[in-house]
């Protein structure tokens, strides 16, 4: 086994799959999580339960690892910055400062000369009234929120009358487009413009939660080239190391927009485990550990189904064929809209 030990902040399914990616390379892992029942602890070599603001526990974690990464981007910046003073954090904490805040993220993308949907900062009710041209639109909290949380759909101006939100938080209003398709580009950057880029993954959402992902995506070649170029520009401008996901919209006129950046491994990339020679998870570990880039090869076309809430019960009792791969996240409690597992179906022959 390698002498290297990676610390992973966060103990959900992405943490579990990162641990498995590290295990493929004989690299040890320590999970730090604020959930004592974190499912990733089963796959790690060691587990530390503690709050992300608990300095004493964080210092104990620092002593046990050689470098640190994370499975989700909403770790407090101060915690990442503290860790980075003693053990290198990859991707670097400064990146999180941008992508933790939706307005900063959109501003960054536009400064790269890359298109997003129209948007405006909202700090008070009068800002909404002054920007009705962006309605229909989505009002989102600038911080936190995922899978539709912290988002308010404004179909028309009259919806403003029924809006009851806390303006002590910052918001962003994004103009809705005539959506044709959503897809993601997952890229692993090894530094110095050395990239491994996975082919576009077409995504479908239900109730603002990812439900289906598939490769190949049914997307025009010109859009594919542009999307890969944009993802590479974003990764290079951030001086990113590791796996990153850029999510895209295509409108009815075939215009391309960046929706958001995920500075980590991504749900849509679960299918890379069974469809590529190297998964997004293993590639992330390779990059942050300074290992050389290996040639990426797609072996199979594939479809991934997210298993949400109570759906997991029936999936646990099913029998699967040799082209189906079921992954149960091992979460202790079943909750509505909670991602409980996934099924990947590969197309052989």
What are these model-predicted stretches?
Residues 1-95, 99-100, 104:
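ATP-binding N-terminal substructure of ATP-dependent carboxylate-amine bond-forming enzymes
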Residues 2, 286-349:
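Peripheral (often C-terminal) accessory segments that flank ATP-dependent C-N-forming ligase machineries
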Residues 57-58, 127-130, 159-162, 312-317, ...:
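Short, conserved charged micro-motifs
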Residues 98-184, 188-234:
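Active-site nucleotide/adenylate-binding loops and adjacent lid/helix of ATP-dependent enzymes
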Residues 225-246, 252, 262-310:
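Active-site "cap" helix and flanking loop/linker of ATP-utilizing ligase/carboxylase catalytic domains
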């Amino acid at each position: 086994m390698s002498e290297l030990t990676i610390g992973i902040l966060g103990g959900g399914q992405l943490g579990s799959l990162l641990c498995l990616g590290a295990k493929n390379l004989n690299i040890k892992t320590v999970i730090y999580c604020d959930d004592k029942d974190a499912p990733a602890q089963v796959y790690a070599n060691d587990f530390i339960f503690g709050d992300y603001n608990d300095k004493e526990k964080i210092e104990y974690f620092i002593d046990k690892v050689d470098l640190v990464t994370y499975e989700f981007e909403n770790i407090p910046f101060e915690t990442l910055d503290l860790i980075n003073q003693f053990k290198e954090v990859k991707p670097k904490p400064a990146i999180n400062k941008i992508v933790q805040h939706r307005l900063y993220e959109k501003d960054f993308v536009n400064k790269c000369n890359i298109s997003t949907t129209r948007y405006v900062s909202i700090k008070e009710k009068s800002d909404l009234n002054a920007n009705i041209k962006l309605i229909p639109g989505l009002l989102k909290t600038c911080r936190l929120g995922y899978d539709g949380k912290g988002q308010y759909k404004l179909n028309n101006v009259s919806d403003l009358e029924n809006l009851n939100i806390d303006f002590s938080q910052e918001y962003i209003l994004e103009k809705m487009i005539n959506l044709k398709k959503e897809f993601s580009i997952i890229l692993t950057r090894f530094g110095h413009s050395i990239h491994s880029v996975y082919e576009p993954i077409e995504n479908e959402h239900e109730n603002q939660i990812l439900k289906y992902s598939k490769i190949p995506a049914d997307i025009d070649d010109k859009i594919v080239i542009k999307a890969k170029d944009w993802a590479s520009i974003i990764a290079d401008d951030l001086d990113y190391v590791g796996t990153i996901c850029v999510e895209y919209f295509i409108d009815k006129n075939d215009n391309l927009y960046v929706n958001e950046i995920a500075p980590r491994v991504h749900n849509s990339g679960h299918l890379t485990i069974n469809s590529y020679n190297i998964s997004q998870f293993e590639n992330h570990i390779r990059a942050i550990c300074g290992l050389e880039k290996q040639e990426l090869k797609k072996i199979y076309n594939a479809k991934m189904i997210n298993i949400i809430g109570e759906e997991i019960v029936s999936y646990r009792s099913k029998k699967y064929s040799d082209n189906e791969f079921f992954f149960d996240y091992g979460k202790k409690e079943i909750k509505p809209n909670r991602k409980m597992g996934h099924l990947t179906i590969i197309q052989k022959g």
